[in-house]
Amino acid sequence: KTWHAGWANSYSVGIDICQQPSLKWKNHYVKKGYDIQETTNDTGRGEKRIISLDPNVALAVREAVKSLCTALDIPYQFPCGSDGQSYDGDFYHGVVDKSYLINNFTGVIGHHHITKKKWDCACWWDTLFG
């Protein structure tokens, strides 16, 4: 059981992306050899200027999520639409209704879908799953 997703811990498998989007971490990741750049976060969640997700990290996360979805028979789908209660349309980066997530949703969510307090990994969601 994971402990970082609050109420969703009982309903989820947690994956930790070991990279931070905040610009204050840029020099740290450059020194470690990450392939990152400064970029704009257009999700409306978190800081406006961020560092991009390293392509190797993005690939590893994407493949891990796909593998978990296959192994656990979880549909590889995400909250979309104007309120996150659709599987079609643009990705939704807001908080999705808790009752909907518990009773109706089956798929992949991020911290940003369950609480306003966390904005990771909204800024990288399109890179990861788009």
Task: Give residue ranges: language-model regions.
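Active-site-adjacent loop/helix surface patches within enzyme catalytic domains
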Residues: 1-76
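Catalytic cores and adjacent binding grooves of peptidoglycan-active enzymes
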Residues: 7, 11, 52, 60-63, ...
